[in-house]
């Protein structure tokens, strides 16, 4: 193990090395970490699984004792669980009997009360059925009227579409902007852009076109300024 992490208790001192004079006999200082720590051999004691202890043990008898103890503990647990399950079963049977008795008593009381309420329930049921039939009839009439109105609107719209789609039956002029008689060709989205048809009219120009290496004095710049700036 390295001792580089330990503090330095013996710094460099002169006087005793070769080529140095004897200054004096300096006192020595020792640290407890520099002293020997383990100076005695340790031997196995009694009960630490020595060879003599292992020879004295009867491993077969110990194994048989452990097996007997395990069987005895298992039987004790089984008997305790069986007794607890038997007591639990008895308790559940008792609870079931009590609940059955309470249910029978409740049924008897319900039969007495139901016999008194049968007459009033029949009258209420008849009134509710009559009201329900009335509501159903009103809703059916409303639905029929609504369907008839929707049908009339659809027929009217269909006839309008037929008349608008026939140019012979449409009285609006062809140049108008109405939706029914607009037969003119629509303008393109790029009709009014700045640099459209820049090469138009090149053939009509004079053959003696001179090139000027100045964008400001060029013919294109002059025409552009005349058209869009002035």
From Swiss-Prot:
Entry GO terms, CC: catalytic step 2 spliceosome; nucleus
Keywords for the protein's UniProt record, in alphabetical order: Coiled coil, mRNA processing, mRNA splicing, Nucleus, Spliceosome
A Pfam family this chain is assigned to: Cwf_Cwc_15
GO molecular function, one term: RNA binding
Compositionally biased tracts (Polar residues): 25-34
Localization annotation: Nucleus
Annotated Acidic residues bias: 104-125
Disulfide bonds: none
Annotated region described as Disordered, given as residue ranges: 1-157, 164-183
Any one Gene Ontology BP term: mRNA splicing, via spliceosome
Composition bias type Basic and acidic residues, residue spans: 52-78, 131-157
Residues forming coiled coils: 47-82, 119-164
Family per similarity comment: Belongs to the CWC15 family.
Function: Component of a spliceosomal complex that is required for activating pre-mRNA splicing.
Assembly notes: Component of spliceosomal complex.
Protein name: Spliceosome-associated protein CWC15 homolog
Protein's organism: Caenorhabditis elegans
